Amino acid sequence: YAPSAEHRATVDRAVRELMATQSADGYIGTYPDSCHLGDWDIWGRKYVLLGLLAYYDQTKETAALEAARRVADHLIAEAGPGSGTNIAATGWIGWKGLASCSVLEPIALLYQRTGEKRYLDFARHIVRSWDEPNRLAPAGLRLIQEAIGETAPWKMSGAPKAYEMMSCFEGLCELYRVTAEPLYLEAVQRLVDALVRDEIMIAGSGSVAEIWCHGAVRQSEPLYQGMETCVTATWMKLMYQMLRLTGDSRCADRLETSLYNALLGAMSPRGEWWAYYSGLMGERVHSHQQFPDVVMSCCVANGPRGLMITPSWAVMTTADGAAINLYGKMNSTVKTPSGQPLKINMESEYPVQGNVAATVNLPQSEAFALELRIPQWSKRTAIKINGEPYDGYILPGTYASIERTWNDNDKIEVELDMRARVVDAPSGVGDAAIVRGPIVLAFDSRLIPRRDGVTEPPMYRYEFMRDTDNYIDVQLVENPETPAIWMTFDVPCKDEAGNKHILRMCDYTSAGNTWQEGNIFRVWAQQPFDFRHLYTNNVDWRVNVTVGVGRPEIPDIYKK
């Protein structure tokens, strides 16, 4: 996404050095022979394969593909058909084979690139192993059966490790691409439905201490180690898979929610560090502070992966044309059905504002469908083509499919419904949050300081002023006093005597973004809320730091 000679040289060197570690039998990994298949060995091999295949896709360097073949062949010899080893019984005991079985994804990808049947056979063998009882899972993992049977995610497989479980289903998506086995796609869809219903929180992620936890219902509670960044990134990757396979615009809605909230909220302002966990209340804490013994954690690696898939889903090709999934200032180029380049130049301040203007550039006029995503929350959407109102269907949660002969320099205007909504907590406990467009709002101690009480009479308990449809008249603040905050809002509230007050809130990504002790934030607030308890005591860095008695210092990678 940012090609340069320096980046090319860095990647080339990394791949050369990685391949140089390959042993004579094909193994690339960090475990001695006596420890193969244990703990995170196959998980590490999975990422070696993904890296080699990604490099091959980018460069067509056959040495990388051959190295990937040798890694896979060595694994097949150790844990494939006829090896006597059930791959679902390998790996760290706590996660019952989920990590090892997620190697399904690169094995299916390797088959796609080589057409060599042994890789397809191994992929199918991995899926069959899920049904076999083993020493780690006496009833077997049963991932497909439990997904289709709508088992609650936090009960699935006896080890509801969120990141690794979704990774297995990513592999199932790739296997579906080469087999067209409908059961595979149905299983993934059922899992997605269950995660949306039971686990994914308002910011577009889930998990507590890395496992599914019925988080959709529990999200307004003070949760220990909430929303692992690996879960955020993998949820986004799974949604990207399902967007490609189904064309369901709600997948793009979820990608957008995760991008603008959970993912960017986990990234430090300079981008050099990521959080391991990011709650909906408390403080921002870098991964190195949360796990000082790890430093370069899985979350520091995965955060950028979630970020870097964004150009891939922002504008996509379809069977009949192209789809615009993400609005904002951008230039994109995709192919039309006839193969000519379709350039879309978009001007917009979205998601700060809801107006989008796009220009279509084509070498020659062509008839095709341009799909415009209508977010599920945008109940009032207006579209114009060359200044004329579009008279087709504009339905929230779908695409507006504009089929016409497109000409060079055609203009598209979209006006999205940016009215803020009050969302009641799914638990029914009386908490509420505010969402404007895709942006989740939060209280921040820089805007509403922690306090012991309110001195102004008559009351100190406030609640959001919503209308009968749960909309609230939130106003964007121009030129806010805290420039480090991306979006600042004036939010109308009323006290228990009925008097109106204006409180300041900000976007979730900016909330707590000094990443320092004492900068506290909160998304869900009890209705009505007491200022003395707006920021829950002891829900700060302590809920996200696993060792030590004080908040650790973060290393500055910019220091020489």
Model-derived features: positions:
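Long, well-ordered core segments of solenoidal/helical folds
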Residues: T10-Y27, E66-S83, D121-L141, V188-G204, ...
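C-terminal beta-rich recognition modules with glycine/proline-rich loops and embedded aromatic residues
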Residues: A123, V188, D253-N261, A266-T359, ...
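C-terminal beta-strand-rich structural cap/linker in extracellular carbohydrate-active enzymes
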Residues: F368-E371, I383, I402-D417, V423
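Asp-box/WD-like beta-propeller blade repeats and closely related beta-sheet repeat scaffolds
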Residues: D33-I42, L49, A64-L98
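Solenoidal tandem-repeat scaffolds enriched in leucines and small polar residues
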Residues: A79, S83-N86, T90-L143, I148-M156
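Short linear capping/connector segments at secondary-structure termini
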Residues: T30-H36, A88-G91, A147, I211-V217
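Solvent-exposed beta-strand/loop surfaces of large extracellular or lumenal domains
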Residues: S378-E403, V422-S427
